[in-house]
UniProtKB/Swiss-Prot annotation:
A single GO BP: DNA recombination
Keyword Transport: no
Native species: Cupriavidus taiwanensis (strain DSM 17343 / BCRC 17206 / CCUG 44338 / CIP 107171 / LMG 19424 / R1)
SUPFAM superfamilies from the UniProt entry: Recombination protein RecR
Entry keyword annotation includes Zinc-finger: yes
GO molecular function: DNA binding; zinc ion binding
SMART domains assigned: TOPRIM
Chain intervals annotated as zinc finger (C4-type): 59-74
Family annotation (Pfam families): RecR_C, RecR_HhH, RecR_ZnF, Toprim_4
Name this polypeptide is given: Recombination protein RecR
Lineage: Bacteria, Pseudomonadati, Pseudomonadota, Betaproteobacteria, Burkholderiales
CDD domains hit by this protein: TOPRIM_recR
Amino acid sequence: MKASSPTSLQALVEALRVLPGVGPKSAQRMAYHLLQHDREGARKLGDALRGAADHIRHCQRCNTFTEQEICETCLDDRRDASVLCVVETPADQVMIEQTLTYRGKYFVLMGRLSPLDGIGPREIHLDRLLARATEPELGGPVGEVIVATNFTSEGEATAHYIGEMLKARGLKVSRLARGVPVGGELEYVDAGTIARAVMDRRNL
């Protein structure tokens, strides 16, 4: 007769499977490692996940992750408020920050257009992006919008849509240079390549 795992262990394995790239076997190995070798680490992990889930929210201005209503980047008067960089995820924002070449503000889409998956303009907050880029009470109108979506087919389609939307409002719109490889995602590109792509950006 096949032995069954305790219910709480099964629940842990299933919970770990929500992580990207983690299949059933990997989740099982993680669960057994935590319980067999690092129970204190497991408790800290649980507390950290619970704390983040309870306290992290979206910035009301740029939509990135923050614990406040407005994030520190949006509140930083030392940054160039005339330039707005549009990225897909907070992880992409971190990658651009690590280049130390960009000192403007951001807007985070939290995704990209993918009609086959039911992700349209509303799901990636393009109405909020338009307001952020144009309305004075939100810091607009900005002098330039840099579209830094990934160079995947969905990212390119998103960049084109955003470019047309903002150019119709008279805004200058640019795109990262092709230093980032086709199909590449910013999260996995080195900082030097991203820095060059930002500096050599082209008009849309």
